[in-house]
Amino acid sequence: MAASIAAATASAALQQVVARPAPVAGWLTFGGSGARPGATASTVGPLRASWFAPLAGTVTSQPLVARNVPRKGDTTVYVATSAGFVYALAANGYVRWRVDLGRFVLPACPQVPDGWGVTGTPVIDPATRTLYVVDAFGRLHAFDLATGAERAGWPVVLYRDYRRELVWGAMLLVDGAVYAGTGAYCDLPMEGKLIRVSLADRKVSGWTVVPPELGGGGGIWGWGGVAYSPRRDSLYVVTGNAFEGGTNKGAAFSEAAGYGEHLVELSPGLDVRSSDAPAPTGFTDLDFVGSPVVADPSGCDELIVAQAKNGMFFAWNADDVPSGPAWSLKLQKADPGAPLLTQPTWSSRFRSFYVATASKLVRIRLDAACKPQIAWQTTLGDATLYPSPTVAGGNVWLGLPVKDLSGVAEALLGVDAATGRVKVRRPIQGVSFAPPTVVAGTLFLASMHGLDAGGFPLARGRPASALDAYQSASDAAHRWQSREDGVYSTEDGGRHWHRIYPRYAAQVLRISKTTGLISVGSPATSCGCATRQLWTQNGGKSWRSAVVGQSYTASRGAVYWWTDNTLFLAAPNLRSSTRIAQTEDTIVSGTPVAGGIAALVDRREKAPQVILAQGAGTRLITLPAASPNTVVRTIRGIGGDLVVRGTSVATSTADPARVEWTSKDGGQTWSAPS
């Protein structure tokens, strides 16, 4: 008996070891690590056609890549968009999961075309296999890497005044805490903050850059957010200018009041350890809008480097920040119309920093005496904003948002890190402002039109899929490739392919430039993803297109669809569409009703509205008012009733309250919100 018990115990132990998931590795935070170097030893081989995934919303954050998720040997790419969507994509572009966190539209600040959803790059905790991301309403979410399910007790509210504060930069994960810095919308009044959330108890604490009595301001704007030095166990942020107000006004006004326009070193508990405000040079707007980078050059002191809008590159000795910059360089002319807005990259292999200015890619090399030298400058072309570069192997990679000297626009550039020679120039879909991500020889680049893998969109071939292909007679007639994990379409005989994601299990539209909307069908998946819409208003002479989410519904053979604030009815032959309603605010959802559609309009600080389109008649119905902090999401037919659902985003830190309106007469009248 003892022997059999021992054997059973050994077997159970063996099963435990086998079942333990493989460790998560990859590119888990902005820049590859908390130091924000933006460099990796991984090399990128010859670029080849791969895949292009159209996403709902503009992408300004860096894609993250986790290997061994969801299973050993798998790779998953995580991308967040300004429309408030977070995607988990397989290595072949297949959508594993997607969540909609909502977006905030602020007409006074239209810097991002889709409104404000997720701007800062999320961070991955490999130990708990969790993705942390902040939405536009100041909520820090925790999602299971494999499933997208929210962890128990989350989200946590970081700040409640989401109309004045925004997390611009990347999250940082250090020793059981997540950090996020806040800025504002278009320099609207606010107080910049560094916020800490303890993952063990979800306790929120913060440090204010410039207190209100000094006028506030001091936003933490940089794409890299907060940097971390393991050697000093310190956090580093650089800040924007203080605003005029309180005692900081008149002749006493200073943009460096409080900790405005400073490099600040803080403990993990948010106590200030040291700081410095460099003297202004050029125009006085010395905002730091890149993020600090921690560099560890062999044989030299550890450096903290950052760039300012006036074209200056500063380097501080990490052990002596208060003494001011150890050295500085002027990289471009001080120009308010084309400020230096990018993030530097550090390569220990080449002992060099790489910076994209308003017109050039610059290599700053540290010599044997630890002195900076401009090794080379490669002209790129004039642009207001370049993305930050990434060093992978022997090349520097970055997106090109304007035409370069060869006339190529919207391209991925590969530049020799040693010589500055342009070795690779590949066209991409749309402008890219995010640094490339390189893992295991594959390059992922987020653009204003979606995500490119391998550096450019699908070309000369069909995309890879995890599932077997299925092609209907209609697909063959229109030269479309349909797959169970989505719909792919071609508009040029197969040279390029477009993937169209279904939104609901019961509906999918197949579309093309030549025939418009041509079918409504049932895909074999319940994947909730984005949909590419093309439409014509002149009988097919010209077409417009957009990538949007949750944007159409079919009602007894009629197809209704919407983009932003306009509702359309497709013609019976589906070759054109007619505009049937237009609002001042955003249409977010729709559902079939008798003889037509009920479409939900989100008006943020006002009561939501419902467009009721039935037959030839259209009515605009205003629902009973709810809290101004309510965001409406969906309208659905449930058990014979129509139900509008929303969320109060400032009610509870752990369980945001759901708000509902109900109509029992097909949308004519509505109950007060509950």
Language-model-detected regions and their locations in the chain:
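Extracytoplasmic/lumenal domain signature
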Residues: 17-25, 30, 37-59, 66-79, ...
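N-terminal "mature head" segments of proteins
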Residues: 40, 461-501, 506-513
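Repeated scaffold domains used in trafficking and secretory/extracellular systems
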Residues: 61, 120, 164-169, 224, ...
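Trp- and S/T/G-rich repeat-edge/linker motifs of beta-rich repeat architectures
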Residues: 459-464, 495-503, 538-548, 575-583, ...
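Conserved Ser/Thr-centered positions that define the repeating blades of beta-propeller domains
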Residues: 420, 490-491, 536-537, 569-571, ...
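Secretory targeting and sorting signals
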Residues: 1-13
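Short beta-strand elements that form the blades of beta-propeller/WD-repeat-like
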Residues: 77-79, 132-133, 303-306, 352-355, ...
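Short, solvent-exposed coil/turn segments at beta-strand boundaries
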Residues: 73, 127, 175, 347-350, ...
